[in-house]
Regions:
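A generic secondary-structure micro-motif detector
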Residues: 18, 74-75, 194
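Alpha/beta enzyme core
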Residues: 1-70, 86-93
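Catalytic alpha/beta core domains of metabolic enzymes, predominantly
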Residues: 46-180
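A mid-to-C-terminal "edge-of-domain" accessory segment
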Residues: 124-275
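Generic anion/oxyanion-binding catalytic loop in active/binding sites
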Residues: 14, 104, 230-233
């Protein structure tokens, strides 16, 4: 009543809603709305249930509060926070919540960039958010919080749109959908070539092209691939752009000059010793 008297928008938060008796939860929420609540927010506290519960409870709460907006707050303890948000949305929730890079207590909360993208791509909503600005914002928050963006963070991670297996590169260059559900540019991210033991010459060619190292012929690409596989075993980790560039340069010289296997091996060894 005090907040309403001051003209404030009253957002009430019902915490741990999934472990409350549903009838009792609805009784509490009904009284809060009668007292003037402008927004009802249901908060799972620690995600102790499956997504279907969020939809079920959201439907029940929405039937109780009518036109009063329903918000949902979920946590990622079981890696289900985003699914919980979408289930609540399908149950009638109008306000979804997340955070940049999924930052939050314990395992975090939904990554708001992906949550917003899902709402637009799959549900057709206009969120009013400039989605392609999320990557810049993600990197800014990571810097300010001194918490690097997780490599595999959907949408914003460095490898979120990376492809390694050779089968991903044997398709026509303009085929971007056979192995992608959405374009990295939606969130301002980019796709990357991640080399691994499943990579082949087409992946080598694509990475060289992306790095402006020229268009490699198949023979040169195979020379690079041979050494890339050796390096991956030795280093037990990804190759840096610098090392890849040096491998391409050595292979290109070998192909152009017709170096023997022994000469090429000596060149590789000199490169590794200088690395």
């Amino acid at each position: 009543a005090y907040g309403k008297s001051k003209g404030a928008t009253i957002n009430v938060n019902t915490m741990d809603f999934t472990r409350l008796d549903l009838d009792w939860l609805l009784e509490i929420i009904g009284r809060l709305v009668e007292a003037g609540a402008d927004i009802v927010r249901i908060d799972d506290i620690c995600a102790p249930c499956i997504p279907a519960v969020y939809e079920h409870h959201a439907k029940a709460v929405k039937a109780k509060i009518g036109d009063v907006p329903l918000a949902i707050h979920s946590h990622d303890d079981f890696d289900l926070a985003t699914a919980a948000q979408l289930s609540a949305l399908q149950g009638g929730a109008e306000i979804l919540e997340g955070c940049i890079n999924g930052l939050g207590e314990r395992a975090g909360v939904p990554n708001i960039a992906v949550l917003a993208a899902i709402c637009e791509i799959f549900y057709g909503y206009d969120t009013g958010i400039r989605l392609d600005g999320f990557q810049e914002l993600s990197e800014f928050v990571a810097q300010v919080w001194n918490q690097p963006i997780p490599e595999h963070l959907p949408g914003n991670g460095r490898t979120a749109f990376s492809h390694a297996a050779e089968v991903h590169y044997v398709l026509p260059s303009d085929d971007q959908w056979s192995f992608n559900a959405w374009a990295p540019s939606v969130l301002g991210n980019t796709d990357k070539v991640a080399l691994c033991h499943y990579s082949g010459p087409m992946a080598i060619k694509r990475r060289a092209s992306d790095m402006s190292l020229g268009e490699l012929d198949t023979a040169t690409a195979n020379l690079v691939l041979e050494q890339v596989r050796k390096e991956l075993k030795l280093r037990n980790g990804p190759l840096t752009d610098q090392l890849f560039t040096e491998l391409v340069e050595v292979a290109a010289r070998a192909s152009a000059s017709g170096e023997t296997d022994t000469e090429r091996l000596e060149a590789w060894n000199r490169l590794l010793q200088s690395d």
